[in-house]
């Protein structure tokens, strides 16, 4: 019976410690468009492209947040980070096209095709930026800010609320996945 409690403690600690890390590193840094400090740069994390080359609904929500930041003057540049191959399309190219249709000039959009995951996106952004606003979905925001800060970026974040857009089932599934991804992120190298 004692071994069961030891295993239970290790499992709970193995989950609680990474979640505490993400919450601690992002404490006070999860903001809204109207109260996030202006940094000049936003990093939009990819979230998939449909087969017809249109951003997924979750990605559209993230891009809409980035557009609002641009329109509010909080950022002058938007880094769109994602996979170069998402259902036959480059995620960053699709993201730029969506932002262009909203009125963001191409010269304000920087493509990062090395963003195959959040860790890679943050690592690449850290090579040129010491502060930025991470734009992702709310369930993904704390881990994203924590990873950006691990790479030396003074990051704040603004999240899109997928549940408010009728994506509750996707949001619930992604939240469960996010716990495991946070555990993984905690153990990744710096």
What residues fall within each predicted segment?
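A structural signal for short, hydrophobic/glycine-enriched beta-strand patches
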Residues: 21-175
């Amino acid at each position: 019976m004692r071994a069961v409690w030891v295993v239970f403690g290790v499992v709970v600690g193995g989950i609680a410690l990474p979640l505490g890390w993400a919450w601690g590193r992002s404490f006070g840094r999860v903001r809204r468009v109207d109260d996030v400090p202006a940094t000049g740069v936003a990093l939009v994390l990819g979230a998939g492209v449909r087969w017809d080359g249109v951003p997924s609904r979750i990605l559209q929500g993230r891009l809409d947040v980035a557009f609002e930041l641009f329109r509010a003057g909080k950022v002058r540049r938007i880094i769109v980070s994602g996979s170069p191959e998402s259902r036959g399309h480059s995620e960053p190219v699709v993201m730029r096209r969506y932002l262009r249709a909203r009125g963001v000039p191409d010269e304000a959009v920087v493509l990062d095709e090395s963003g195959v995951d959040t860790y890679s996106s943050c690592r690449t952004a850290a090579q040129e930026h010491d502060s930025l606003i991470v734009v992702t979905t709310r369930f993904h925001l704390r881990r994203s800010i924590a990873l950006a800060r691990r790479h030396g970026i003074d990051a704040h974040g603004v999240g899109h609320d997928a549940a408010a857009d009728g994506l509750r089932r996707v949001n619930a599934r992604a939240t469960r996945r996010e716990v495991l991804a946070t555990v993984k992120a905690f153990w990744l190298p710096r």
